[in-house]
Amino acid sequence: MIAVFSLIAAALAVGSLVLLPVVLRGGCLLVVTIVWLWQILHFWHWRRLGVPFVPAAPFVGNVWNLLRGACCFGDQFRELYESKEAAGRAFVGIDVLHNHALLLRDPALIKRIMVEDFAQFSSRFETTDPTCDTMGSQNLFFSKYETWRETHKIFAPFFAAGKVRNMYGLLENIGQKLEEHMEQKLSGRDSMELEVKQLCALFTTDIIASLAFGIEAHSLQNPEAEFRRMCIEVNDPRPKRLLHLFTMFFFPRLSHRVGTHLYSEEYERFMRKSMDYVLSQRAESGENRHDLIDIFLQLKRTEPAESIIHRPDFFAAQAAFLLLAGFDTSSSTITFALYELAKNTTIQDRLRTELRAALQSSQDRQLSCDTVTGLVYLRQVVDEVLRLYPPTAFLDRCCNSRTGYDLSPWNGGSPFKLRAGTPVYISVLGIHRDAQYWPNPEVFDPERFSAEQRQQHHPMTYLPFGAGPRGCIGTLLGQLEIKVGLLHILNHFRVEVCERTLPEMRFDPKAFVLTAHNGTYLRFVKNSL
């Protein structure tokens, strides 16, 4: 009897081994089916709410092209803005990976959310961990509303028109060094070909180093200088940093668990060391340079002990982000401007004629800040460059109203309330190239910004510096920086296309700020005004 049972047990064991692969395959198929159905239900979110939406792919939502490196943030949101599902809609539902979000399209609705109802959309969706990342979480871009409000109140006077005018001397000094750098590059020749973004990045790095740190970075004289190396370091796509950025932008609720950092450890050490040194040195010397360090020292003397400025890394956080945001956005804008001027010689000739007249009527051929800001056609050119190539090609906010936000009037009358915590996005690039607001939007035409045509612009369709209370605090400084760079280049050079110039501009898919892909090469011909 025992032998019989042993034979039966052996047979069952053999049968189990035979059936095991079948069971495993069946189990895997069941799991895959459940996950797939869950994905389908997840991405039916907008359908269930009766909201128009762009169909999403399982697991990746509507950002597959961005994730696979086929396009940048700006191009991805423009693609969604121009999708057939979004046409004629005030807003459309999208999915950024697993995050349900809205893409706003109607300028009146954009104004409501960015300006009129700012209190209900006062923070951005992306965030970093304030406990681990004391430097990244305190700057004006990433900070949540309470921190942003205090920081903005402190630094808004630094970027006011009068303060920016006082900084003009620092900008003009570096502009002269830009001219010297280009003359050295020319080496007695009649013309030269240069990669423009690199040239402009050296110029803007030296400007931000002077304004934010009160030091001379000497990037134009030595492109391998430490300060310039740190500007490259902050954009270095190392795996660990990419993971942190990915979490901050797509899964901000996990920032605390991951311990995200906006900057690399090396960049943070450099910022702390530089800030401590400069503050100590300036306090001893008593020098007044009309820069950010002057503001820091004044705050240390006047702000009470409970002020936000006494938090760890507060000053370093502001200077670090000014460097990150200031050098890249302005250098890209100058690059795009030179690219368009090289392709549109009639516009370049008119701009250089305006500059020549201003130089001839000025004392010692030196232009004052008021003269530069008063150059009408230069302003039109810069404004049109910022329309065609907005540095920040998309904007975002997060609904922070606990009771949600009623969007029924914008949903064709159908009831719909946006849930708390839901992000909303605005495709600045999409709006700026929408033929509904800008006829022939792909054409570079500074006349769009003539005094007559400005009056015809639709409100909230020109957003290169954002809008509302959380719009770019450094708008005036950024515009002046761009103008000074262009003037010092066009003062001595005519810009032309060369064999390596791309016929159509393509954007770097790895860059957050709108940046030319694989460089922008132009010919600079010696032709002083």
UniProtKB/Swiss-Prot annotation:
Keywords: Endoplasmic reticulum, Heme, Iron, Membrane, Metal-binding, Microsome, Monooxygenase, Oxidoreductase. The keyword Endoplasmic reticulum applies. It comes from the Eukaryota. One of its GO terms (biological process) is response to DDT. One of its GO terms (cellular component) is endoplasmic reticulum membrane. One of its GO terms (molecular function) is monooxygenase activity. It is found in: Endoplasmic reticulum membrane; Microsome membrane. May be involved in the metabolism of insect hormones and in the breakdown of synthetic insecticides. This is Probable cytochrome P450 6t1. The lineage of its organism: Eukaryota, Metazoa, Ecdysozoa, Arthropoda, Hexapoda.
